[in-house]
Amino acid sequence: MLIACFFGMMGVMPISNFLVSLVNSHGGGSTALGAAQFLMAASELPSALVFGLLQKRMSSAKILLISIVFMMVKPLLILASGSLGMLLAVQPVQMLGYGLFFPASVYFANESVAPADRVQGQSLRTIVAISLSTLLGSLVSGYLLDLGGTTLMLWFSTGCAF
């Protein structure tokens, strides 16, 4: 599961990090970038608020897998967006991707290790599934963005989640 989280995050974090390039490629400027960032951030809040209720219906592992699927869907939807309006409309998918990922990964790490090892489990989750994946995803995506633009970067993001 840690490997799936690594690749899911490696695919989705460059979208946040290079959102300015995505907005510019759709004809937007600073105002549109602010709107896109707002939509992404605001859509994560409901996920955090309803996570406890959702977890009563399914395991954190299942929620984690669902979030990774939506991390794969988001770059595909961005690829399909032909206008700035469509790009902005895609941003709330963050609710079902990263919005669910973060609380589910915390709970999953706690459930997967012995109580005495939970600090190490959370540290490993943070280092591998978030820090290293973001570092590598951003490095590769930045290169691909220079090499072939946002389309190539988004195909990389999609491929990471598979």
Regions found by a protein language model. Give the residues of each.
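Helix-loop boundary and gating motifs at the non-cytosolic
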Residues: 1-36
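Intracellular juxtamembrane helix-capping segments at the cytosolic ends
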Residues: 100-114
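Helix-to-loop junctions at the C-terminal end of transmembrane segments
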Residues: 46-59, 145-146
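A membrane-interface helix-boundary motif in multi-pass transporters
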Residues: 142-161
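Loop-to-transmembrane helix entry/capping segments in MFS-fold secondary transporters
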Residues: 30-31, 113-126
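Helix-loop junctions at membrane interfaces in 12-TM secondary transporters
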Residues: 79-91
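Residue-level signature of mid-helix packing/kink "hotspots" within the transmembrane helices
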Residues: 41-49, 131-135
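Structural signature of the two symmetry-related core transmembrane helices
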Residues: 62-77, 158
